[in-house]
Amino acid sequence: MFKIEPHIEFESNKNTAYYSLFWSQLEKADKYKITTSVPSVSGLYEIYYEDAEKRLNLLNVAIAWLGGLRSQIRSDIDSDGKSDEVKEILETYSLYYRYTISPSFDSIKDVAWFLNKTYFKDASMSQHSGRFETIYVKEFAPDKIHWV
């Protein structure tokens, strides 16, 4: 496993955006560890749960902007106020998270849109920035968990 700093790199060519997404290491979700280790800056994160067969299942891809990654991830792993289906998952299974950092809201929106479209086949879950006709994302993760 190699150590990388989570961040998003960006290049463009005419109406096409090319993003390189560098994830943090996947960590077991614990609100106290999140408080001390996750930065309170803007970025993008994923929440996973480990099912009974010990497989990781992607639960959520989300943007953290004004509240920062720390508060958003903590809020997302808290079962209070969630639907019954999500609440059951949060209370039953082990949860994991990873994140990346970016100061650019447009870049975060583009990458979140691409990941939601790719993972969940639903581009309506988020909106891209509108700057490009085509968006590509390549993922890099220290623990080799890649979905695209």
What is each of the regions a protein language model found here?
Residues 1-59, 63-148:
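Boundary/linker segments flanking structured domains
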